[in-house]
């Protein structure tokens, strides 16, 4: 079988964004605050600057409905891992598990959302 190296190089080059690192969630803490919840999420991501950085994380239910979103306003090149919180997350009564996933500026999400037990 003869390999077409220019075609192979083009295929590898076009897949480069897919090979970028997605954010990794290391820890999630959840705390009841009145009728709402606060989540504190610890993320690790190889931020390189404004060209590629973890730019947010979201809280979703089992069906993927967004319950909250925390925008990350700048790269954390020299602060890894880092923790950021989101207040006033409304979790529907009776919901015992929510999920958190992080996003980066390259459009990648955490490989698998992290399940978080909602204390009752």
State what each model feature region is.
Residues 21-57:
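Short, surface-exposed binding/anchoring microloops in extracellular/periplasmic proteins
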Residues 1-7:
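Bacterial N-terminal signal peptides that target proteins for export
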Residues 52-77:
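The feature marks short-to-medium sequence segments in extracytoplasmic or secretory-pathway proteins
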Residues 69-108:
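Short, solvent-exposed, Trp/other aromatic-anchored flexible loops in extracytoplasmic proteins
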Residues 32-35, 59-66, 90-96:
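A short, structured loop/turn motif at beta-sheet edges
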Residues 25, 36-38, 81-85, 97, ...:
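Intrinsic-disorder/low-complexity, polar/charged segments enriched in Ser/Thr/Lys/Arg/Asp/Glu/Gln
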Residues 14-17:
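N-terminal signal peptide c-region/cleavage motif recognized by signal peptidases
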Residues 109-118:
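Edge beta-strands of extracellular beta-sandwich domains
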